[in-house]
Amino acid sequence: MTPKTTDERVRFGVIGLNHEHIYGMVRMLQTAGAELVSFYAPEPELAAPFAERFPAARQTTTQAEILEDPTIHLITSAAIPDERAALGIAALQHDKDFLSDKPGFTTLDQLAEARRVQADTGKFYAVFYSERFENAATVRAGELVKAGAIGRPLQTIGLGPHRLRPTTRSNWFFDAPRFGGIINDIAAHQMDQFLFFTGSQHAEIVAAQVGNLAHPQWPGFEDFGDVLLRGDGGTGYLRVDWFTPDGLGSWGDTRLTVIGTEGYIEVRKNIDIAGRPGANHLFLVDGHETRVIDSAQIELPFGRLFLADIVARTETAMTQAHSFLASELALRAQATAQRIGSEWS
């Protein structure tokens, strides 16, 4: 269902609370003006804190109640990753747009079916690449690159280290088929940023590798992955891992470097180690100087643009092709990755 006029408020439901990203997604949609109507989660321990945080939302006893509600325009989800595609496809088939936490898929077959249904229905299947959409320094970096601040972009380097915190994780977290592997799970962010900053419309995986280098107690887990890729707008390298030490004052020292013909930009998203306090650190080096750029007042426009797209059926927040391609690259890199580490034990 699509809002009938631009004045009609976008109404959305939530199905699946298995990752805490859902709280940020809901907050983003509400801040942009959408109304949370209802939610469903089969796990009482997940439903209770969500209901307390969003008391105006009605808790349903089945997900079908949300899918079949004709007043709901959008469904958003942070379900277990291998369950997201089936839910998203069902949402589209019920005439609703869908916003998924990343990863939006765990297999290439799921992606192919989602593409088919999306083409048939014309509804949005969007993946929420929060490292770009919800990070002010990265948004500002995009504005600078678009304005030509570093010339023509040549390469992105994306680093996505994370802290493991194993006692806070559910069993599915350590089972690669359930989350699609480390490249598919985490590096979907870096694939999105590679496409966005280089302007690539097509890309290929040059090399990829994954491994469980230090956690033999979870044989189905992967704690390291990296990828080299090439697009029609530039090249990219990315590394993701679960080795952030407890001594760091953040869950991960995630970084983005964009190299251009006339300079480069580095974004230290969460922390500037032993440097400036806080997050959202943006550095620009060009032919004249080195600058630290303040991004504190930068608007995060994704929510506003996405809701406008739902109403107008435009693609200003992110194109459908981009959403799918970033996921496809992560899936293809995961599927073709060489497994490493056993020779080091």
Q: What function would you assign to each model-found segment?
A:
Residues M1-F54:
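N-terminal Rossmann-like dinucleotide-binding module
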Residues M1-R9, V14, L74-T76, L305-S345:
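C-terminal helix-rich "cap/oligomerization" subdomain common to oxidoreductases
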Residues T2, D192-D272, G303-D309:
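Contiguous beta-strand/loop segments that form the cofactor/metal-binding neighborhood of enzyme cores
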Residues G13, G247-L248, D253-A321, S342-S345:
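C-terminal glycine/acidic-rich active-site capping loop/insertion
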Residues E43, F54-V117:
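Beta-loop-alpha module in the N-terminal Rossmann-like domain of NAD(P)-dependent dehydrogenases
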Residues D82, F105-T167:
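A contiguous active-site-proximal alpha/beta segment in oxidoreductase catalytic domains
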Residues F128-A136, T167-A203, G220-D223, H322-S323:
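Mid-domain beta-loop-alpha active-site segment that forms a flexible
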Residues E134-I157, N184-L213, D226-T235, T336:
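Oxidoreductase and adenylate-handling cofactor-binding alpha/beta cores
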